[in-house]
């Protein structure tokens, strides 16, 4: 973790030998924009288009050569993160590749304005500017989180603010160098490559702007609310004029873990309720913050200054979800809003997700199902919807389901889960894998599973019933091998899941915990490869009388069903 107390490198001039150099046979160096311990950023001219661009290259000092592999990994991670995003409030990637000496580089748009770090040291921001800044950062974070990207190092120097835009204040999130990819787009089942393990950068976060779970290196707890904590730190500094905690690096880290947040002394023009909003962002436990950026954004709406347009209104985009808005198919793709006239180099083609084009009738029908389940009464038929998309490989079934997955997440409408199936079954197939991913438990042992669930569910040590459910969930997620006795974990309980009925009861209870007060979106990818037990579970979900609201969307290949009568009959029955 970075121990420096400042996070804004002063702009410097490039060395004389670098000015005029053409990198990657395309980008002519104009000057240096800044540098850090492991990289340098240049202002360049794209000789192919004439555009001004920012080129970031990895540069490892000789005395830190042993970190080259790790830093190279995180540089590629940043490229993958930026390439997967397409939002007006996030810096846009244009190219990625390797220079002649083998070091990786990433080319991005040059952004107007100055960093929030510079603004807050030179200007007192008006309340209307602060409101727009927070709203737009929340919009960008919601987009990133829905695509599995956690920034991990949000701070004033990583947010640009343009006050000269004709559309009003514009904020941009940049520098995803420590981005955490929660569910990479690459499917290791396609080429046999091992799935990348979740890991935290050895320097994750910057002192003063880092969440308690990052300080504790509690990887399972890192998620959307981690970035929201960092945003709370930024808001505190902008509103109050000082950081949340001050002192030595160690004192600040210790305070972020344990010390209550000092009261906010707000300027007179700031609504009183903003103090509680910031306090919620800065809660020590992630599950006490807003669960999604969209939740925070809806709460932030209450403080909007009079006549202040929302981000979508300013950008001529369709408003966010409500039960009465038009279906998503009528909204312009974000790429159409920000990509006009820009040229992308082929280096990003292997990293960028294919855009979803057309398919308006299908998207409208899917969105209608989302709306119906979202406003339904628990326990009614409409609160449990199931949709199957069947077609040949390559027609876009999974991309359509993924689009819906991202939309319900970005707008905070449902809790999205993805259950995947392969020809060779693995322990993380299906709903088991989806729940493991949701709780960040893919690499956790049984003890860690129980510890995480006890934390997340805030189980009272004296509550035998809740502890039993923890043990039952751990047994479902980490089954005891036949002929052995399940270990006694932190719950102090043992639970045997030995019948389909009991297994279903556990699954239903877990899904209720996952959904809490909102519906669950459950995507079954390649359902034709699943076992009969999965179809039985779906049938039980359809008949369930619990408070669970769920939209299940399944994709299956028609050519596979044509040669597998049993699977075809199960799909037909569903």
PLM region spans:
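Key residue(s) within conserved catalytic/signature motifs
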Residues: 153, 175, 270, 290-574
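Hydrophobic/aromatic scaffold residues of ePK-like serine/threonine protein kinase catalytic domains
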Residues: 84, 133-134
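C-terminal lobe helix-coil module of Hanks-type protein kinase domains
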Residues: 45, 135, 160, 208-312
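AlphaC helix of the eukaryotic protein kinase fold
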Residues: 59-84
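Conserved short submotifs of the Hanks-type protein kinase catalytic core
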Residues: 101-115, 119
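Activation-segment/catalytic-loop signature of the eukaryotic protein kinase fold
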Residues: 96
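Conserved N-lobe ATP-binding subsite of Hanks-type protein kinase domains
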Residues: 40
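Protein kinase catalytic-loop region centered on the HRD/HxD motif
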Residues: 138-149
């Amino acid at each position: 973790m970075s121990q420096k107390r400042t996070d804004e490198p002063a702009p410097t001039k490039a060395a004389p030998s670098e000015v005029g150099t053409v990198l990657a046979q395309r980008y002519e160096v104009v000057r240096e924009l800044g540098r850090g311990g492991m990289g340098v950023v240049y202002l360049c001219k794209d000789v192919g288009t004439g555009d001004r661009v920012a080129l970031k290259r990895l540069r490892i000092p000789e005395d830190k050569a042993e970190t080259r592999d790790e830093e190279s990994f995180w540089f590629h991670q940043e490229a993958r993160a930026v390439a997967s995003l397409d939002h007006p409030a996030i810096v846009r990637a244009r190219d990625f590749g390797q220079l002649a000496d083998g070091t990786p580089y990433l080319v991005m748009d040059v952004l107007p304005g100055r960093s929030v770090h510079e603004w807050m040291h030179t200007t007192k921001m008006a309340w209307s500017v602060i409101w727009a800044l927070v709203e737009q950062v929340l919009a960008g974070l919601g987009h990133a989180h829905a695509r599995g990207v956690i920034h991990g190092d949000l701070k004033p120097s990583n947010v640009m603010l343009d006050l000269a835009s004709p559309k009003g204040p514009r904020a941009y999130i940049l520098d995803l160098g420590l981005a955490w990819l929660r569910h990479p787009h690459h499917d290791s089942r396609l080429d046999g490559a091992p799935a990348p393990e979740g890991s935290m950068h050895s320097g994750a976060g910057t002192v003063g702007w880092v969440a308690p779970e990052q300080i504790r290196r509690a990887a399972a707890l890192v998620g959307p609310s981690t970035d929201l904590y960092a945003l709370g730190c930024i808001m505190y500094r902008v509103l109050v004029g000082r950081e949340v905690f001050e002192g030595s690096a160690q004192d600040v880290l210790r305070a972020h873990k344990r010390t209550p947040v000092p009261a906010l002394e707000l300027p007179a023009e700031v609504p009183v309720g903003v103090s509680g909003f910031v306090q919620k962002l800065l809660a020590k436990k992630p599950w006490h913050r807003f669960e999604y950026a969209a939740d925070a954004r809806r709460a932030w709406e209450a403080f909007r200054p009079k006549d202040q347009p929302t981000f979508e209104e300013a950008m001529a985009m369709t408003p966010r979800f409500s039960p009465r808005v038009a279906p998503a198919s009528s909204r312009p793709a974000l790429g159409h809003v920000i990509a006009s006239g820009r040229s992308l180099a082929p280096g990003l083609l292997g990293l960028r997700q294919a855009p979803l084009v057309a398919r308006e009738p299908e998207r409208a029908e899917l969105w209608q199902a989302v709306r119906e389940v979202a406003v339904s009464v628990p326990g009614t038929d409409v609160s449990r919807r199931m949709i199957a998309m069947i077609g040949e490989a390559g027609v876009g079934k999974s991309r359509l389901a993924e689009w819906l997955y991202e939309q319900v997440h970005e707008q905070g409408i449902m809790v999205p889960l993805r259950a995947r199936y392969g020809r060779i079954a693995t322990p993380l197939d299906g709903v088991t894998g989806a729940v493991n991913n949701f709780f960040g438990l893919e690499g956790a042992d049984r003890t860690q599973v129980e510890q995480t669930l006890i934390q997340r569910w805030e189980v009272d040590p004296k509550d035998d019933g809740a502890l039993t459910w923890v043990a039952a969930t751990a047994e479902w997620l980490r089954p005891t091998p036949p002929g052995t006795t399940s270990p006694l974990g932190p719950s102090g309980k043992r639970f045997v899941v030995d019948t389909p009925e009991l297994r279903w009861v556990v699954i239903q209870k877990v899904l209720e915990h996952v959904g809490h007060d909102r519906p669950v979106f459950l995507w079954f990818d390649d359902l034709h490869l699943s076992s009969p037990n999965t179809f039985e579970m779906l049938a039980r979900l359809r008949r369930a009388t619990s408070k669970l609201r769920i939209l299940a969307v399944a994709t299956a290949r028609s050519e596979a069903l044509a040669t597998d009568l049993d699977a075809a009959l199960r799909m037909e029955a569903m």
